[in-house]
Each structure stands twice: as C-alpha cells, then as structure tokens.
A protein has these predicted regions:
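Active-site loop/oxyanion-hole signature of alpha/beta-hydrolase fold enzymes
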Residues: 34, 38-76, 106, 112-118, ...
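Catalytic histidine-centered segment of alpha/beta-hydrolase-like enzymes
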Residues: 244-257
Length: 269
C-alpha cells in the first residue's frame, strides 16, 4: 500500500519521540511520518528572532523528504511546529501539498503589532511561557521519579500514560547518575522569547500556494488568548475541534490521529 509522506514538527520542549504513539496511529492510517527529533538544537539552525533559521531547518528537512517522494509533501505541526510548517510553506512555494496547524492559532492584526512592541521592550520573557521554562525543574534521581513528578502536574495529568512514558524515556537523558531534561531549557526559553510577530506580513508577501487546515483543543488557553480571526481567514474555515487542552495530541493520540487523517484527506491527501 502506498504511504502518504507527512513531515511532522513538534511543539516547543516536546521532541518528536514524545509523539511516538500518535505517529504509530498515523502510520497505521497510511501516512509515512518523518520528523526532526529536536528543533533548535542544531548549531546550523540556531534560534533567532521570528524563527528564521528554524523555518529553514523544517524547509530543508521537508525538501529532503520531497526529493525522496518525487514531489511535494504534507506538513503538519503542533504549536511551534505548526507555525514553522506554515512559514516554510509560505517561503518555499511548491514544497508542501498542504499544511495542518495543530493548536497553532495564527497571530495577526493588532495582536501581532502588540507582540512586536512587547518584544522590542524586552518584556516578552515575563509574559510568555518563558517566565516558567527558564526555571523549570530539570533533574530527577531516576526515570520513575521523573514519571511521578510529571504525572501529578496539572499540564500532564490528562496525558495518555503511554505518551507520558515515552516523554520520560526520550525526553530525559542519563547524566551523572540522574535523569535530566533532554530539551535544553535555555533553548526552550529562547524559542518563546523570539516568537514571530511577522506572520501576517509574511503571508501577505508570500501568499500560500497550498490549502491550510487547523485542529484545536476546546480547552486550549493558547487558542483563546490568540483568537481565531486570522486562523479562520487562512484556513478558509477548515477547522476541527477536539476536546482537550493545548496538549491534546498527548492526551488523546488516537482521536488526534483520526482528526489529522480527516483534515489531510479533506485537503486531498
């Protein structure tokens, strides 16, 4: 059976292996999923303002997959990964057959301008998740201790257990006899601090040549904060909502896989 090439980009601080359960469901549904394991950690693609180099990292990775497939591929991404996928498709026409934003609402209009002002005043670190990420605990005596720590944190409490165990297994590494977060906290914080304030301008200068869809979580605080006006415009109403928070792909991997298949098939996959 022919598999549909799909390049998936992860959310900030949750490397691709965290989505292993979701990827397995997608592969069962006929998608050949490929992903960069850890965005922001390759010195050839440093974190910079408006994520210029991260966008290029996704574009270069997707182009390699497109060359293997003999044509454009589908791009999907969760949060950070969704924005990078959208920007890569805009900057590189012909790369993507379509883009799927997974709880990655597009910031536009006055909100985008306000973000630019906040970044210019160097206040974004105190207003974004960066305020928490730079001081987050990142060391545990064992893998099981890390599992128990995250299991009882509100943001992780609804996660599918297999997904949480994948996060602990792959998202922490052995160092000096302890388990340490594999995703560097400074890089995570820097990604938040350099969040793009130019998305609407970028899309005006580089009109998308492919369809875009969005899947959101009904309880997503991120979606409510950003608003959906720009997203509705860019997707032309191709929107699916699932019960869950911003991290619904980790909470409901099977339902998320079904929604991803629906969204991509609807766009012609």
């Amino acid at each position: 059976m022919h598999s549909t090439p799909l390049v998936f980009s992860h959310a900030n601080s949750f490397q691709a292996s965290t989505y292993s359960v979701l990827f397995a469901h997608l592969r069962q549904r006929g998608f050949a999923v490929q992903a960069i394991e850890k965005l922001g950690h390759d010195p050839h693609y440093p974190v910079s303002n408006n994520w210029k180099h991260l966008v290029q990292q996704v574009a270069d990775f997707a182009k390699a997959q497109a060359d293997k497939a003999g044509g454009p591929v589908w791009l999907a991404g969760h949060s950070l990964g969704g924005f990078l996928s959208l920007m890569a498709a805009a900057r590189h026409p012909g790369l993507a057959k379509g883009v799927l934003l997974i709880d990655a609402p597009i910031l536009g209009g006055w909100r985008s301008m306000a973000l630019g002002v906040i970044k210019g005043a160097q206040l974004v670190g105190s207003l974004s998740p960066a305020a928490v990420s730079h001081k987050r605990r990142n060391t545990w005596p064992s893998q099981e201790a890390a599992y128990e720590h995250f299991k009882h944190k509100r943001a992780f409490s609804k996660w599918d257990d297999a997904v949480l165990r994948d996060y602990i297994a792959h998202g922490t590494v052995e160092r000096d006899g302890k388990r340490v977060l594999a995703f560097d906290r400074e890089i995570e914080t820097n990604i938040y601090n350099t969040i793009p304030d130019n998305l609407d301008r970028l899309l005006r200068r580089n009109p998308l040549k492919c369809p875009v869809s969005f899947i959101g979580g009904r309880q997503s605080w991120e979606m409510k904060r950003v608003g959906m006006g720009m997203t509705e415009k860019v997707t032309r109403g191709r929107i699916i909502m699932l019960d869950g928070t911003h991290l619904f792909p980790m909470e409901k991997p099977l339902a998320t896989a079904a929604a991803i298949e629906t969204a991509l098939r609807n766009m012609g996959a």
